[in-house]
Amino acid sequence: MAKFVSIITLLFVALVLFAAFEAPTMVEAQKLCERSSGTWSGVCGNNNACKNQCINLEGARHGSCNYIFPYHRCICYFPC
């Protein structure tokens, strides 16, 4: 009986060690830096148009209209 308990204990320890080493690693979220659009002209009033322009023309991850004194501007977000 003692041999059976030691084998079960050994298997349990091996399973715990295996689970510890096989845990998925989390990738750190990529930080985004914002920059005024270089291709947008005028006041930004359409978030979707700004987003499409940032992605398609400037290669950004996304874009949005943000208020930066004195008016709304199209801001593009790029990986830092």
From Swiss-Prot:
Organism for this UniProt entry: Raphanus sativus (Radish)
Cystine residue pairs: C33-C80, C44-C65, C50-C74, C54-C76
GO biological process, one term: defense response to fungus
Subcellular localization, as worded in the UniProt entry: Secreted
Domain of life: Eukaryota
Protein name: Defensin-like protein 4
GO cellular component labels: extracellular region
Signal peptide annotation: 1-29
Family: Belongs to the DEFL family.
CDD domains: Knot1
Chief location bin: secreted
UniProt cross-references to PROSITE patterns, sorted A to Z: GAMMA_THIONIN
Family matches, as SUPFAM superfamilies: Scorpion toxin-like
UniProt function note: Possesses antifungal activity sensitive to inorganic cations.
PANTHER family: DEFENSIN-LIKE PROTEIN 1, DEFENSIN-LIKE PROTEIN 13
Keywords from the UniProt entry: Antimicrobial, Disulfide bond, Fungicide, Plant defense, Pyrrolidone carboxylic acid, Secreted, Signal
One Pfam family here: Gamma-thionin
Pyrrolidone carboxylic acid modifications at: Q30
